């Protein structure tokens, strides 16, 4: 299982509440349809004023090739472009991980 973890910070023109609403209601449903995506979670800080980012997204794919194909697809490009409308993508941190489940 390959996981892409991304930290996101809201753009300067959005409040945390606007960012969270847009993410949940607009962006997440779009990204949820990425080809090959098996699991998708997003977490928001309980105290956004003291957090260093506004969301942590985790997208799970069967392997790295499937993940790369998903983001190379037309929908993948649309998801990336949409993220740029509400988040500071230059500040986003991305890491690709191979996950081992210890407790489920």
Segments predicted by a language model, with ranges:
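Macromolecular interaction modules
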Residues: 1-104
């Amino acid at each position: 299982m390959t996981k892409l973890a991304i930290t996101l910070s809201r753009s300067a023109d959005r409040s945390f509440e606007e960012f969270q609403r847009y993410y949940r209601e607009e962006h997440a449903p779009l990204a949820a349809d990425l080809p090959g995506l098996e699991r998708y979670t997003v977490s928001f800080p309980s105290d956004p004023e003291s957090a260093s980012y506004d969301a942590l997204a985790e997208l799970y794919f069967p392997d790295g090739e499937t993940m790369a194909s998903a983001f190379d697809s037309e929908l993948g490009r649309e998801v990336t472009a949409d993220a740029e409308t509400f988040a500071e993508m230059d500040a986003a941190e991305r890491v690709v991980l191979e996950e081992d489940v210890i407790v489920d």
